[in-house]
UniProtKB/Swiss-Prot annotation:
It is found in: Cytoplasm. Pfam families: CLU, CLU_N, eIF3_p135, GSKIP_dom, TPR_10, TPR_12. PROSITE patterns: CLU. This is Clustered mitochondria protein homolog. Residues 379-649 form the Clu domain. Gene3D superfamilies: Hypothetical protein (hspc210), Tetratricopeptide repeat domain. mRNA-binding protein involved in proper cytoplasmic distribution of mitochondria. SMART domains: TPR. Signal peptide: none annotated. The gene is clua. InterPro entries: CLU-central, CLU_dom, CLU_N, CLU_prot, GSKIP_dom, GSKIP_dom_sf, TPR-like_helical_dom_sf, TPR_rpt. GO terms for cellular component: cytoplasm. Keywords: Cytoplasm, Repeat, TPR repeat.
Length: 1320
C-alpha cells in the first residue's frame, strides 16, 4: 500500500470546503485545461502482415511508437510478429519518437509494419515469444505470473432489460426497416407485370408475416435461442457456474475452479540444436543459430534462424547439411514456417490464439510487479528442456555480461526533466515510474541470489552480518544492527524498523518534489527471514576520495552501510572525541526548508557537541546531506522524517514516529478550529457594535451567514509545525520556553490521536461505517486515518470496542504480527535444505492442536531428518509463550488465550502466508490435529518487496476531483475528469495499476447512475481484472469488485451471469470472512435479491434468514436492519403466495419500526399500510379458496346425482313416454312421476326461478354462504387504491392479487340469482 499524505474529507470537517475548495478547483481547472491541449486523441491505422490486415487504433499525441508496439504484442492477431519497423509514406520512423513529433501523422494516417532483418538477440526473442505463447495452451492460466480468475466465473449474456434510450433506438431501427421494406416493395411493383406482381405480393405478404413474427418474438425468445446455441459442454459449465444449492461450508481445495479449456499442444519439443553455434563460414550466409523441432506428427526438423527469417535445412542428428530443404520456403516468422509443414501445429496454434482472444483484454497484460497468491493448485512439473537451457541462452540478464546499468543516473535524470505543463509532467512521471519498476525487479533478483549465497560480498573479510554486495550496480546490505546503534531499542528488530522508516521518509520527500534535492532509489526485500536493503549508489560513495562528505546533519551514527567508509575517515579525525558533530550547509538548508514546510516540520536548533554551538536544522539530526561527485545534493537516513510519537517517548520506542496522515489531519483540524474561533470573535465584535448602536440582534442562522472571513483572515491562519528532534538523543538548543512550546505542540497531536482519531475509528467500527474483514483492510483503514498499528492493543482494551467481531479481528492481527517476527528468526537459522520442514513445523506449532497423537518415537524419527536444531527446539508451548511476550511488548496487550480460535485459523493462515510470502497447496487442512501441514504442502516461498511506488500527481488530482463531483451528483463533469485521469494513468503506468482500476470503478458507477448498464458492466470488468492482478485473487477489494459487477448484471437482466459472480463472492466471504463478518449479511441479501428475480423463492428466503441471523448477532433483534430484512422476507413470501408467513414477517418489521421510530414516522406508516394490504389480500384469497372448495363440492354432488339418474334411466327401459314438462325438471319431480304421485301446480314465477337455479342447490346453508360472499367488499380494490409504499416488491404482490380479482368478482356475480331466489 502506498503511503501518502491524506487530508480529511469534507464530511469530517464541514468548514473545510469553504477554506480550501477554491484553491483545489483552480488547480483542477488548470490541469484540465492543460490536459485538454495534450490529450486530444485521434485515430490512425496500422497495416499489419497478419490476416487481420489493417486495424484502427485510438492514440494520444504523447504516445510513442514503443507504446503502439506494445499494443500489437498484446493483440492476439499480431502477437507473433516481433521484428518489424514502422513506416509512414515509405519513410522509416524511429521507435522512440512521440507521435506528436512525427510529421504527417495526423487523423486517419496509416502506419505500415515492415519486417526487418534479425540479429541473434532479436531472433532468440522471437523464438522465446512463440514458445511462451505455445506454453499458455499447457498452463492452468493464460498469465501464470499475474493470473486472473475472472474468465473462470464469467458466463457473458446479453442484457434483457433495455433502457429508455435503447428502447427508442430499437423502435427507430424497426421503423427504418419497415420503411426500407416498403420502399423495396414499391420499386418491385413498378418493374414487374401484373401477374408477377400478384404472385410476388403473396410472397411478400408471407415473408413480411414471418419477419414480423420473428421481430416480435426476438425479445421473448432471446434466452431460449441462446440456450439452444450452447454446446453440451457450455450447458454443463453454465449449470455448474450458476447453481446455488444453499449455504455450504466452503473448502480450500475448491479455491481454483476447473479450467474450461483443455490443454493444447503445438509441438512435442523445440530446442536449440547441437549444431549450434554457427560455423564461421555459415555466418557469412547469414545463419544465426539452429533449432531442432519435433512435430506432433512425429517427424523432427532442423530449422535455421537467419537474418532473413527461418527455413528448414537438410541436417540430421548425424550429418550437418545447412542447405535449404525443399519442404518449405523461407519465412520471416517461425510460426508461418511451421504452419506450412504441420497441420497439427496450425490447428493447435489457432486454438491457443482463439482461447487468448476469448479472455479479457487485460488478462495477458503483466502488472508493474507480480502479486503472488498464497494458495497454489496442485500441479506437476512439466518436462521442458528449454527451461534448463534458458539459464544459458536467456537474454533477460544480458546487462550482467556487459556494462551494468547506472541506476542512480537513470533514477535522478527524470527528476530533472521540465514539469511546467501536463504533457511534460506525464513524460516525467512515466520515466520515473518505468525506471522504478525496473530497479525493483532487479533488486528482487539481487536479494534472492544474496540470500541464497550465490554471489560474493565486496567485503568478504568482515563478519557475515556486515557483508555488503554489488549486483548489477545496486548496493545491497542486511538490515541488521551491525554497529550496535539500536541496542537500546531492540537491536536487529529495530534495524528492520529503521529501514522501513527510511523508505517512508523517501516517499515523503519524493512527494514533496523539491528541485535540487535528491533521494536514493530504494527497495526493501524480505526473503527467507532476511531483510535486504537495495539502494542505488551515490557517485563516489564507495571510493576513498573525499568527494562526498556530509554537508548536513549528524556524522557519528550512520545507519546505512553506504557511509561506512566515509564514517571511518571521520572517526579517525575525531577518534578521541566521542561527540555528535552536526552540520548545516546553507544551500542544503534552504532546500530542506521548502520540504519541511510541506511536511509540517519546524526549523529547530540543536547543539553540535564538538563546537558546543547551536545549529539550525529542519530535519531530524540523524538525517544526512551529501553532495556526490555528480554535483547533486542527496538526503539520506530519513528514519525520522516525521516527529516522534508523544504517546511513546521511552528510549525503547525511539523509532516510533507519527504517520504523515495524522499530521495532515491534525493540521487541517487545527486550521478549521482557528477559523471558527476567528468567526466567533468577529461575530461577538459585531454584536457588541450593534448593541451600542441599538440594533436588534439577528437570529442565530442569520448571524452565521452574515459573518464572512476575508482573504486576509484566511492568510493569517496559523500553520502547524513540529520539532522533529524532540525526545531524541541530541541536545536541544533555543530557550527553555521555546523547547516547552515545542513539546506542548507535539503532545497536542498525541492527545488528538488518542482523543479524536481513535475514538472516531472505534465509533465507525461499532456502527459498521467501515468494516475491515481481515488484517490487510484493517491496516489500510488505520493507516489512512493516521493511526499506527502499535495502537492495536490500545483499541482492543477500549471498552467501546468490546464487540466479538472487532476483538477477533484485532487479536488475529496482533498475533499474526508477533508470529511473523518469530517466523523470521526461525528461517534465519534454518538450512536451505530444511526450509520446507521449517515452514511446515512452524505452521503446525502455530495453528495445530496439541492432541498427543504423535508419539515420541515419530518425533525423534522426524528430528533426525532435520539438520537445523532450531526446528527441533521449537514447540507449540514455547512458540505461543514467545508470541504472548511479543504482543505484550509491542502492543501492550495480554492475549486471553494461547491459541487461535478454530473458526479463525484459516484466516490467520492466509494472513501469515501473505506477510511471509509463503505459498501452500490448495487442500483442506484439518486444524484439529497435531500436524495439519506437511513439508509437501509448502509449494513456494516468494520475496516480499516494499518500494517507493511513484504515482502521477496530475492523475491523482483529477481522480479526487472526479470523486468529489460524483458525490455531488455532477455526473457529466465527474465522467470527464475521471476519463482524463484514466488517460494519464494509462500513459504513465499502463492499464494494470491500482489507480487505473479506481478510475474504471468510478466510471462504472457513473454509467450505472446514467442507466448505461452495458457500459457500466464493461468498465467494472476492467476494474475487476486490474484489482485481481494488483491486489490479489481474494483481496477484500476484489470481493467488492465481484459484488458490484454482479449487481450491475442483475440490474441489466443478466441473471445467470450475475449468479456466477455472486457464487464466487459467497465462496470467498464464507471462506475468509470470519464467523460473523458484517459483510456476510449484505452478500446474503444481494444473493437473495438475484434469486428472487429468478423466482427461486425458497432459496432466497433461506439466504434472508441467514442475513437475519447475522444481523441479530451483530446488532440486536430490534435493530432497524432487522426490520428491513423482515420486510424483504415478507415480499419474498408474498411473491411465493405464502401470505401467512408474509404477514408474520411484515408484522415483525412493523413492530420494530414502531418501537424504534414511533408510529408517526413515515417508514412506520408505509410498513403498516403494506401490512394492511397483505392482510386484505390474504383474506380475499382465503374467501376465494373457500368459494372454490364450495363450488367443487357442489359440482361433485351434482356429478353423483347425475350418475344415479343415468343408472335409473338404464334400469327403466319400459318408460317410453314422459311429459315434456318433466324433461327439464328437477330430480324430485322425476321421482314423483315415477312413483305415480300427482304433480303440484306452480306459478310461472316459481318455475322460472327453479330453472335458473342450480340443480343441487337446495340447502339454506349454501344460500347463506353465497349471500355472505356477495356482501363481502372487494379487499383488493382497497389495497389497490390505498396509499401503500411504492416499493417494487409490494407492486409485485399487488400484481399477484389483481390476477385473482376477475375470478373473485365472477364468483360474487354468480351468487346474485341465489340472492334473488332467497328473497322470493
Amino acid at each position: 500500500m502506498s503511503e501518502t499524505i491524506d487530508n480529511p474529507t469534507v464530511e469530517e470537517y464541514n468548514e473545510k470546503e469553504t477554506v480550501v475548495s477554491g484553491e483545489q478547483v483552480e488547480q483542477v481547472e488548470q490541469v484540465e485545461q492543460e490536459n485538454e491541449q495534450v490529450s486530444q486523441s485521434f485515430q490512425i491505422s496500422i497495416k499489419t502482415p497478419a490476416e487481420i490486415g489493417t486495424i484502427n487504433i485510438q492514440v494520444q499525441p504523447t504516445d510513442t511508437l514503443i507504446d503502439i508496439q506494445s499494443f500489437l504484442y498484446e493483440t492476439s492477431e499480431t502477437c507473433l510478429y516481433s521484428s518489424f519497423e514502422f513506416r509512414l509514406y515509405g519513410k522509416q520512423i524511429p521507435e522512440y519518437s512521440e507521435l506528436s513529433s512525427i510529421e504527417g501523422l495526423v487523423e486517419g494516417a496509416t502506419l505500415e509494419m515492415v519486417p526487418v532483418d534479425y540479429n541473434e538477440r532479436s531472433a532468440k526473442l522471437h523464438v522465446k515469444r512463440l514458445r511462451d505463447i505455445m506454453n499458455t495452451g499447457l498452463t492452468e492460466f493464460a498469465n501464470m505470473n499475474n493470473p486472473s480468475l475472472f474468465t473462470s466465473f464469467s458466463f457473458p449474456e446479453k442484457s434483457n432489460i433495455l433502457t429508455e434510450e435503447q428502447q427508442l433506438e430499437e423502435q427507430k431501427q424497426k421503423f427504418e426497416q419497415q420503411q426500407q421494406q416498403q420502399q423495396q416493395t414499391e420499386d418491385k411493383e413498378e418493374k414487374e407485370t401484373i401477374a408477377t406482381e400478384q404472385q410476388q405480393n403473396k410472397k411478400n405478404k408471407h415473408h413480411n408475416k414471418k419477419g414480423n413474427k420473428k421481430n416480435n418474438g426476438d425479445e421473448s425468445l432471446n434466452n431460449e435461442n441462446n440456450e439452444e446455441k450452447l454446446t453440451p459442454q457450455q450447458k454443463e459449465r453454465k449449470q455448474k457456474m450458476t447453481e446455488i444449492k444453499g449455504i455450504d461450508k466452503p473448502m480450500l481445495s475448491s479455491y481454483y475452479p476447473e479450467s474450461p479449456i483443455a490443454p493444447v499442444q503445438c509441438v512435442k519439443s523445440m530446442i536449440y540444436s547441437g549444431w549450434s553455434p554457427v560455423p564461421g563460414y555459415r555466418k557469412l550466409f547469414g545463419d544465426l543459430f539452429y533449432l531442432d523441432i519435433t512435430l506432433l506428427e512425429g517427424t523432427t526438423i532442423c530449422v535455421t534462424a537467419s537474418t532473413q527469417g527461418f527455413f528448414i535445412n537438410q541436417s540430421s542428428n548425424a550429418t550437418f547439411n545447412p542447405s535449404v530443404s525443399p519442404k518449405a520456403t523461407i519465412n520471416h516468422s517461425l510460426h508461418q514456417l511451421l504452419t506450412q509443414v504441420s497441420r497439427l501445429f496450425r490447428r493447435g496454434l489457432n486454438q491457443i490464439l482463439t482461447n487468448i482472444g476469448r479472455n479479457h483484454p487485460f488478462d495477458m497484460l503483466p502488472g508493474v510487479l507480480p502479486v503472488h497468491n498464497w494458495v497454489a493448485s496442485s500441479k506437476t512439473n512439466r518436462y521442458d528442456i528449454n527451461k534448463g537451457t534458458d539459464t544459458f541462452v536467456s537474454v533477460q540478464d544480458v546487462e550482467l555480461r556487459g556494462n551494468p546499468r547506472d541506476w542512480n543516473e537513470e533514477i535522478q535524470a527524470p527528476k530533472e526533466l521540465p514539469k511546467s505543463t501536463v504533457q511534460e509532467r506525464i513524460i516525467r512521471d512515466r520515466a520515473i515510474s518505468k525506471v522504478n519498476s525496473e530497479f525493483v525487479e532487479c533488486a528482487i533478483r539481487g536479494a534472492q541470489v544474496i540470500v541464497d549465497k550465490a554471489i560474493l560480498p565486496i567485503n568478504p573479510a568482515e563478519n557475515q552480518r556486515s557483508h555488503m554486495f554489488l549486483y548489477n550496480n545496486i548496493f545491497f546490505s542486511y538490515a541488521l544492527d551491525t554497529r550496535d546503534s539500536f541496542t537500546d531499542c531492540g537491536g536487529d528488530d529495530a534495524a528492520r524498523t529503521s529501514a522501513n522508516n527510511d523508505l517512508k521518509g523517501i516517499r515523503l520527500y519524493n512527494l514533496a518534489d523539491i528541485d535540487g534535492l535528491y533521494t536514493l532509489g530504494t527497495a526493501i526485500v524480505d526473503y527467507k527471514g532476511q531483510r535486504i536493503i537495495a539502494q542505488s549508489l551515490i557517485p563516489g560513495i564507495l571510493t576513498t576520495e573525499k568527494t562526498s562528505k556530509i554537508y548536513y546533519g549528524s556524522m557519528d551514527t550512520p545507519t546505512n552501510e553506504e557511509e561506512e567508509q566515509q564514517q571511518k575517515e571521520e572517526n579517525e579525525e575525531n577518534k578521541n572525541n566521542n561527540t555528535k558533530s552536526i552540520k548545516a550547509d546553507p544551500e542544503f538548508h534552504s532546500r530542506l526548508l521548502q520540504a519541511a514546510s510541506l511536511l509540517h516540520l519546524s526549523e529547530s536548533k540543536v547543539i553540535s557537541e564538538d563546537t558546543n554551538q547551536e545549529v539550525s536544522v529542519c530535519t531530524s539530526f540523524e538525517s544526512k546531506g551529501i553532495i556526490g561527485i555528480d554535483g547533486r545534493r542527496y538526503i539520506l537516513d530519513l528514519i525520522k522524517a516525521t516527529p516522534r510519537d508523544p504517546n511513546y517517548t521511552e528510549t525503547k520506542d525511539q523509532l516510533s514516529v507519527l504517520r504523515p496522515e495524522a499530521i495532515a489531519t491534525y493540521s487541517e483540524y487545527f486550521k478549521v478550529t482557528w477559523l471558527n474561533q476567528k468567526r466567533q470573535q468577529k461575530l461577538k465584535e459585531k454584536e457588541e457594535r450593534q448593541k451600542k448602536e441599538g440594533i436588534d440582534p439577528p437570529t442565530a442562522t442569520a448571524r452565521d451567514e452574515d459573518v464572512q472571513l476575508t482573504e486576509e483572515d484566511l492568510a493569517q491562519s496559523p500553520v502547524v509545525s513540529f520539532n522533529p528532534n524532540l525526545f531524541s538523543k541530541v541536545k536541544l538548543g533555543g530557550t527553555p520556553e521555546e523547547q516547552q512550546k515545542d513539546i506542548e505542540d507535539l503532545k497536542a497531536i498525541g492527545a488528538f490521536l488518542k482523543g479524536i482519531l481513535i475514538p472516531r475509528l472505534i465509533e465507525d467500527l461499532m456502527l459498521f461505517n467501515v468494516a475491515p474483514v481481515d488484517g490487510q483492510t484493517l491496516t489500510q483503514v488505520m493507516h489512512v486515518r493516521g493511526i499506527n498499528m502499535r495502537y492495536l492493543g490500545y483499541i482492543a482494551k477500549n471498552e467501546s470496542a468490546n464487540v466479538p467481531f472487532i476483538q477477533d479481528l484485532l487479536f488475529n492481527e496482533m498475533v499474526s504480527r508477533a508470529a511473523k517476527h518469530c517466523f523470521n528468526r526461525l528461517l534465519r537459522s534454518t538450512n536451505a535444505s530444511d526450509m520446507a520442514h521449517s515452514i511446515s513445523h512452524f505452521l503446525n506449532c502455530f495453528l495445530g492442536t496439541e492432541t498427543g497423537s504423535v508419539s515420541a518415537d515419530e518425533k525423534s524419527k522426524k528430528a533426525k531428518q532435520i539438520k537445523s536444531s532450531a526446528i527441533n527446539e521449537l514447540t507449540q508451548g514455547k512458540l505461543w509463550s514467545e508470541i504472548a511476550q511479543l504482543v505484550s511488548s509491542k502492543f501492550d496487550f495480554e492475549i486471553p488465550t494461547h491459541s487461535v480460535p478454530m473458526e479463525s485459523r484459516l484466516i490467520v493462515l492466509r494472513c501469515i502466508c501473505l506477510k511471509m510470502g509463503i505459498q501452500i497447496l490448495a487442500k483442506d487442512y484439518n486444524f484439529t490435529t497435531d500436524a495439519p501441514f506437511s513439508p509437501e504442502d509448502i509449494v513456494d516461498l516468494f520475496p516480499i518487496v516494499k518500494h517507493v511506488n511513484p504515482r502521477s500527481t496530475d492523475g491523482l488530482d483529477l481522480l479526487e476531483a472526479g470523486k468529489t463531483f460524483f458525490n455531488q451528483r455532477k455526473y457529466e463533469l465527474a465522467t470527464e475528469l475521471l476519463g482524463e485521469a484514466l488517460a494519464i494513468y494509462h500513459q504513465v503506468h499502463g492499464p494494470i495499476h491500482p489507480d487505473a482500476g479506481a478510475c474504471f470503478t468510478h466510471l462504472a458507477m457513473l454509467a450505472y447512475q446514467n442507466e448505461q448498464y452495458d457500459l457500466a458492466i464493461e468498465y467494472q470488468k476492467n476494474a475487476l481484472v486490474i484489482t485481481e492482478k494488483t491486489a490479489g485473487l481474494d483481496h477484500h477489494e476484489t470481493v467488492q469488485a465481484y459484488t458490484t459487477l454482479a449487481v450491475f448484471c442483475q440490474r441489466s437482466g443478466r441473471y445467470n451471469e450475475s449468479i456466477g459472480y455472486m457464487k464466487h463472492v459467497l465462496y470467498l466471504t464464507d471462506l475468509l470472512g470470519g464467523e460473523y463478518n458484517p459483510e456476510r449479511a449484505s452478500i446474503y441479501t444481494a444473493i437473495a435479491a438475484i434469486l428472487e428475480d429468478t423466482e427461486r423463492f425458497d432459496l432466497a428466503l433461506e439466504f434472508l434468514k441467514q442475513t437475519l441471523k447475522h444481523q441479530e448477532f451483530l446488532f440486536t433483534p430490534d435493530h432497524l436492519m432487522c426490520s428491513t430484512t423482515y420486510h424483504k422476507m415478507a415480499i419474498v413470501c408474498a411473491r411465493a403466495t405464502n401470505f401467512d408467513d408474509s404477514i408474520i414477517h411484515q408484522k415483525k418489521s412493523t413492530d420494530i419500526l414502531e418501537k424504534e421510530l414511533g408510529e408517526a414516522h413515515p417508514r412506520t406508516k408505509e410498513s403498516l399500510e403494506f401490512y394492511t394490504g397483505l392482510s386484505q389480500t390474504a383474506n380475499q384469497i382465503k374467501l376465494f379458496k373457500q368459494h372454490q372448495a364450495l363450488k367443487a363440492e357442489q359440482d361433485e354432488l351434482a356429478r353423483l346425482q347425475k350418475e344415479k339418474a343415468d343408472q335409473f334411466k338404464k334400469s327403466q327401459p319400459r318408460v317410453s313416454a314422459m311429459p315434456p314438462s318433466l324433461e327439464n325438471g328437477s330430480v324430485s319431480e322425476l321421482l314423483n312421476y315415477i312413483n305415480g304421485k300427482p304433480k303440484k301446480s306452480q306459478s310461472k314465477k316459481s318455475k322460472s326461478t327453479n330453472t335458473t337455479t342450480t340443480t343441487n342447490t337446495t340447502t339454506a346453508t349454501t344460500s347463506k354462504s353465497k349471500i355472505t360472499m356477495a356482501k363481502t367488499p372487494n379487499p383488493t380494490t382497497k389495497a389497490t387504491t390505498s396509499k401503500s409504499s411504492a416499493t417494487a416488491s409490494s407492486a409485485a404482490t399487488n400484481k399477484s392479487t389483481t390476477k385473482t380479482n376477475p375470478t373473485s368478482s365472477s364468483a360474487a356475480d354468480s351468487s346474485k340469482p341465489n340472492k334473488k331466489s332467497s328473497k322470493n
